[in-house]
Amino acid sequence: MSTPVSLAQSHSCRVDTHAHVFERGLPLTDSRRYAPGYDATLDTYLQLLNTHDIGRAVLVQPSFLGTDNRYLLQALSQDTHRLRGVAVVAPDASEEALAELHRQGVTGIRLNLIEQSLPDLGAKSWTPLLERLSRLGWHVELHRNAQDLAPMLDRLLEAGLPVVVDHFGRPDPEKGIHDPGFKTLLGYGGTGRVWVKVSGAYRCAVPGSGFVHEATSQLVEHFGAERLMWGSDWPHTQYEQVMNYGQSLSTLLELGLDAAMVDAILCTTPALFYGFEQRTNHAVAKYGQYEGEKRTGQPHDHEVRRCDART
């Protein structure tokens, strides 16, 4: 991995909560659904952030790399001030291994279960991991078709874990907001423990439909803007020909939401959730701040409170 350019050119409060970085030649998991035939490097990604005035970002472990988080951690190490990570781990991941990920800027794990067998999160084999995640103050990011979300959400909430649901909850593109699974997801807005990413709409919407506007309106109604977060889904794997970074950002900015809502979705909520502004959970006492924060202190607290995300 080359040294990325312009690591901290942008001081915007905006946060991109969903992007992937990878290169050809990395070891791939046997259970992969696909593998891109191109590079999506941190260098390229940071240039996009700077171009679009995005100050911070969350790198999500690509599904095709499985539980080998080395490339993700290498990317995070390039700018611990600006980047956070979401890893993929095995159910038997040790407390020591998770603590090391925590120190390197990881804030949660992703369960990418698209086209995968559903795990029994209530099984004894999962209990130790869920308890360890809770002690760290981590969240679980859930990626699954809307119709299958409810049982997993119930178990994760029962374990006391915050949950982030990917890509509008992945309703069936043919059903959109009428997908019963999406309607069920709306009911979790009252828990105060579930967040939804308004991202990757092209994965769950018929082109040209009004899905993004309709779904976002319903999510705001049931969750509040303070439980929604935007992600670019860069590099838009399998949809590279129909989407780019600027279009992804415009999808949110052109919805006609008021300034306070956009500020919550794009700035305030993700800044707090991913620990860019401050880490208030009990994990700090046991494991400390991220390595970068130990050196530099908390970045840009005042900017989170002042920004107008639309500009």
Task: Label every PLM stretch briefly.
Residues 122-229, 278:
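Catalytic pocket-lining loop regions of alpha/beta-barrel enzymes
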Residues 31-60, 65-79, 99:
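Alpha-helical scaffold segments that flank or form the walls of functional sites
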Residues 2-13, 38-56, 218, 224-229, ...:
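Mid-to-C-terminal alpha-helical segments outside catalytic/metal-binding sites
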Residues 15-19, 57-60, 83-87, 109-111, ...:
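Hydrophobic faces of well-ordered beta-strands that scaffold small-molecule active sites
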